[in-house]
A protein has these predicted regions:
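Non-catalytic terminal and connector segments of soluble metabolic enzymes
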Residues: 1-202
Length: 202
């Protein structure tokens, strides 16, 4: 009896800093070596609408993130000039400004437990504390503290979906149905017993 492993998907965005540093190939290589399949990929210049839809956060998120920024400012003896929730909103403003300032590479990675696997490969959101061996841990040393002081988005190379539900919400923002390919890889045929046209073998 064939074990039918779910084809989970994750959205990956190689951000402008990853593109500008010519890390596209190295980043894709990490995912493919692990056994994930690239079922969609394109380079584009994001629109403000795309980014605002993608980074759709609520007031609870703004307040939580903004409170952390206020604490960082206070530790450094720097002035706190607005309410915590506004600092939280500034995070999205700076991200949108940054993400629309240069090309990104949008990728759909597919495979068993794809969101968890991609997150593991990418590493923690804050580069300076990301584990060595992860993409962020190996290729950048930026931090929330430095980005807060500089009033800019943290340069952490990549966005990736944290879970299946997030991936299902994010993927349609960046890809149309016709841009997602169905095919099989040698990895799938060896481990999961699928046919060459991407269908499960009987």
């Amino acid at each position: 009896m064939t074990t039918k492993v779910k084809k989970d998907r994750s959205l990956i965005l190689i951000k402008p800093d990853g593109v500008q540093r010519s890390l596209i190939g190295e980043i894709i290589k990490r995912f493919e070596q692990k056994g994930l399949k690239i079922s969609g990929m394109k380079m584009l210049l994001p629109t403000v609408d795309q980014c605002e839809s993608h980074y759709n956060k609520n007031d609870e998120w703004f307040l939580r993130k903004g409170t952390g920024i206020v604490e960082d400012l206070q530790k450094e003896g720097l002035p706190v000039e607005k309410e915590a929730i506004e600092y939280g909103r500034d995070i999205i403003r700076t991200i949108v400004k940054y993400m629309t300032g240069g090309p990104v590479v949008a990728i759909i990675a597919e495979g068993h437990a794809a969101p968890a696997v991609v997150t593991q490969i990418v590493g923690g959101t804050e580069p300076v504390s990301a584990d060595v061996g992860t993409i962020r841990g190996d290729y950048t040393i930026d931090s929330y503290y430095m980005s807060t002081i500089d009033n800019r988005a943290v340069r952490n190379l990549i966005h990736c979906s944290e879970n299946k539900e997030e991936a299902e919400r994010e993927i349609p923002i960046w890809f149309g149905e016709s841009e997602v390919m169905n095919y099989s890889t040698a990895h799938e045929r060896i481990l999961y017993d699928v046919s060459a046209d991407g269908h499960w073998a009987s």
